[in-house]
Amino acid sequence: MDQEGQPLLSKDFQQVLLATASGNNSSWTERAVLNNESTDAVKHEPALGQNDVFDLDPLSFDKWVPFLRRALDKNQLDPVIDELENSIEDNFQGLELQLLQDSQMNDKLETSIDEIANIQGMVQDTLSSEISKFQIRLSESANELIVKKQMYVNNKKISLKISEATILITKVVRILELSSKCQELITERKFFKVLQNLDSLEKLYLQEFKNYNFQFLIEIYNSIPFLQKVTKDECINLIRNSLNLNLGKNLIKVGQEFVAIYENELLPQWLETRSKMKLTNFKFNSPIEISMRDESFLAKLNLGEFFQLDDFHDSIMIFQNLNELSVLSGEFNKEYELRKTKLMYPLIWKKNKTAAYQMDSLLRGTGTTPGSTAHDVSTDDPFTQSLSLHFLQDYFLKILGFLLYDINLNKATEFILVDNNYNSTNEFWDGLMDRLSPYLSYFIDEKLKTEEDMIKLKDFLCIYVAILENFKLNIEPLYKILVSIFEKFCSVSLRAFDDEFQILLNDDDFMPLSINDKTLYEKVLKICWMKEGEHLSLPDPTNGEPFAVTLPFSPLYPMTCTLAKKTYSKITAFLSIFYRHELHTLNNILVKTMDDIFNDIVNKKIRSKLESTSREEIAQILVNLDYFIIAAKEFSNFMTRENILQNPDMEIRLSSIKYLAESRKLAETKLIELIDSKISDILETIEIDWQITEVRQDPDISIIDLAQFLEMMFASTLQNLPYSVQTLLIFREFDSLTRQFMGLLLHDTPSTITHESIMNFEVDVNYLESIIPRIFPSTPGTIDSNGYQSPMTPSTPTFPNANGVDAPTLFENNIKSLEATFMELKQCIELLKTQGKDYNEPEIRLRKYSRIRQEDAALLLSKIQHFVSSVEGANGDDTSVMDSSSIFNSESASVIDSNTSRIAKFFNRR
């Protein structure tokens, strides 16, 4: 709005415009004069001067640019043009009048008008001529254009057809190339690419040539199903070849490599680690062992390094694309079943009504019929005839390789080929073991003989079980075989112990063990289990005394202890590295084995020796049995502490302890019977003259023999017996002896006896009583807490005090108790000596004859009184007296048996 009063053209711009106009006018005038001077120039170039009038000086135009640009920037170009036109009218308004008043200018104008008229005519002629020519040329060009256009259209149609033909030919060539490529790929065994090319070929044909009747293309298209079938057949053949490659000798190699890595790398590393870290309670393949394995060893167990399964991947993709995966699975299973059949050879199923089902179940990995019994093993079976340790190892290695292959194949193919049965490998393994177990049991029972072979088979199968366990396969059937091997090993160890013990028993001298070497003595003490608190008084080497010790047991005991410990160590070593399942079962087998050693072998074989008639041998057996009972108890304690279950609350007690104790009682009985028999034999030789009229001062020679026998027997032959047994025997024999003499006096004497014979009989009885202190040791030793006599040196047996009782007091009490056995007999003798003069007085009778029954007293008095009244008639009865003097008869024997209970009371007295 403010700009409306202001001129849009600045003074500077107006001056430029005016300067330009004046300059152009003068320039035009000069050129017009020059043109007039040259007629030819005007004639030939009439339009040139006219156009030059309107030419602008470029320099002048450049001067306009800043002003025009400014107007453009302000969007004022149109107003500037309008104002410019108005300015021209304003500036040149009086110019026409000025020109008319100028005569020179008028002349020039007239001349110019004529010239302009001439120029106009000339221009018209020229234009007409040019237009004619142009029309002719235009007509020619139009015709030419029409012709060329027609040619172009024709060419374009041809070109289009050529292009279409080219495309078609290209596609045909593509089909031919695909067909040819399929053939090449089939030859190269790249079947998945074959399928891709066939798919492309089919799509290309259906899209482009379905409506064409090209016979060769139709033939190519019709060959697609055939090529697909060829591809499928070749894939199946490829799988067969892959199975041939992987399931041949390669299986044993794979099994060997796996077992070798476990046996030669993982196991030695664990044994070293276990020893260093004192992890003896942990077994191989336990969680702690697995956690400590070297990763470099585990890297060698990558199944992908052992088996090539690329062919399976291609085949699965091919059949998946063809939607015929079930066909592949069926063909694969058929082929796989054949491989499994070859794999199991020479294992053959018995032909029975369930054989077909069992075979099918095994091959399919579904096990056997539920509830089916174990298969019988025939010695004519090829598998049975092939059984050997080497054969079984190779067979199991082959099976292991197959199991690993099956596991790897199923995982790599995502269990597609087994219908997503994730337990297929386990089912096959269980079915195989169900069939194989009877053969293994047969081999263990019948053909596995040596401990070396058992250890080899055990180590191999334990490594085998570890591998199966790490691959999550069922180890139960094979572990049962390992338990059977352990049972067989224990059985063989038991037989070996039996053989060696029999040799030891036959070589044993049944004499106390004398040792002259201190080192040997210390070894014996370490080997043997001794009685609690038992010790020896060893010679003092500083005094120059030779080392000499006699142990109460015979050499059989330490040798048996050594043999038992070695056997136990051997058996536990058999279990120490691998066995870590079913420990209760293994522990029961171990305990039973040791029980059998102590009972079925040691106890029964020693018990058979009790048929001996040697008192010394029976006595030594009794001593040995005492120590074997201790050994069995200590072995029970040892097995409790070291039990393989590692259970601190478990207590093991061998049942053989009871049977050994029974044998000990039997040995006591046998020893008593032998002593009784010997004493009875001696008593049969004793003859007492009851009619004698002379009194002798010395005992009868037969009484002296009897006393010497008793003294020798108790002081030497039976000196190593336990103190309780010695005491029992002493009391029993003296009680039996006094009762037999009592029976002799009451029932085996004639109706009349002389006073002198009574005096002589008293001398004999007093002599027998006098040996009592000599039978018991004069220097008491020590007795252990169980009442056993301690071992001794060859010279002197020792009798300890028991349960806190002073040994001398016990010694005195025993002598007094033993002397009391003669009391009744001595009272009878005293009654006969006094002829019963004071017997009728109650006070005296109770004091002097308390042990004599009234009927016995009456019987005795009748004999002595009868003798007094009929001395003369006594000589006629000598024969009857002699006939009745034998003291060993059935009545006296019954007296011995009836007094057993009373002997026990004597033994328990203090």
Curated annotation (Swiss-Prot):
The modification Phosphoserine is found at S286. It comes from the Eukaryota. Pfam families: EXOC6_Sec15_N, Sec15_C. Residues 88-116 form a coiled coil. It is found in: Cytoplasm; Cell membrane. It is a peripheral membrane protein. InterPro entries: EXOC6/Sec15 (IPR007225), EXOC6/Sec15_C (IPR046361), EXOC6/Sec15_C_dom1 (IPR042045), EXOC6_Sec15_N (IPR048359), EXOC6PINT-1/Sec15/Tip20_C_dom2 (IPR042044). Keywords: Cell membrane, Coiled coil, Cytoplasm, Exocytosis, Membrane, Phosphoprotein, Protein transport, Transport. GO terms for molecular function: small GTPase binding. GO terms for biological process: exocytosis; Golgi to plasma membrane transport; intracellular protein transport; vesicle docking involved in exocytosis; vesicle tethering involved in exocytosis. GO terms for cellular component: cellular bud neck; cellular bud tip; exocyst; incipient cellular bud site; mating projection tip; plasma membrane; prospore membrane. Belongs to the SEC15 family. Component of the exocyst complex involved in the docking of exocytic vesicles with fusion sites on the plasma membrane. PANTHER family: EXOCYST COMPLEX COMPONENT 6, SEC15. The exocyst complex is composed of SEC3, SEC5, SEC6, SEC8, SEC10, SEC15, EXO70 and EXO84. Interacts with SEC4. Present with 4280 molecules/cell in log phase SD medium. This is Exocyst complex component SEC15. It comes from Saccharomyces cerevisiae (strain ATCC 204508 / S288c). The lineage of its organism: Eukaryota, Fungi, Dikarya, Ascomycota, Saccharomycotina.
